[in-house]
């Protein structure tokens, strides 16, 4: 895959979309269904033709692109999003240095793909199985991501499954970010360029 500003922006928007949906799910118990489906499907796209192929098409990243452009501010919501983003990228770096972890992740995703021959991806058991990949493979690498939201909503098992599945999708996008050459310096010095690129993409979708 190409290491261009466009590719980095797409991958970063994928991480932003996961973080934004986690925040919405934890607070409200629901989120944009199409964006959620894109996030979950991205976990299973392990051999895409290009960067956009992970998400199907540019328009499927509207939530993430809009988040990238406008949501990272100094408000409590913006600070929380930033915390999720940094935590996801830190966990991905730990995963990248853990060969066994990458191998286990691949095996578990292959199992999910086989199960999809028999179950719908929205089935609670399927979402539970995807969530368990995050719990079993990613979470032990630490540090744990503290998700904040409405306590009564966060106590619901379906919400927990969806939040963990979304966190796994964030890890998937963080892996993509690294694969297309994303580095910390791009976040520090190249953020403005990514915002401009995101605006260009949003204008055409």
From Swiss-Prot:
This is High frequency lysogenization protein HflD homolog. It is a peripheral membrane protein. It is found in: Cytoplasm; Cell inner membrane. The keyword Cell inner membrane applies. It holds the Pfam family DUF489. It comes from the Bacteria. Keywords: Cell inner membrane, Cell membrane, Cytoplasm, Membrane. Belongs to the HflD family. It comes from Aliivibrio salmonicida (strain LFI1238). GO terms for cellular component: cytoplasm; plasma membrane.
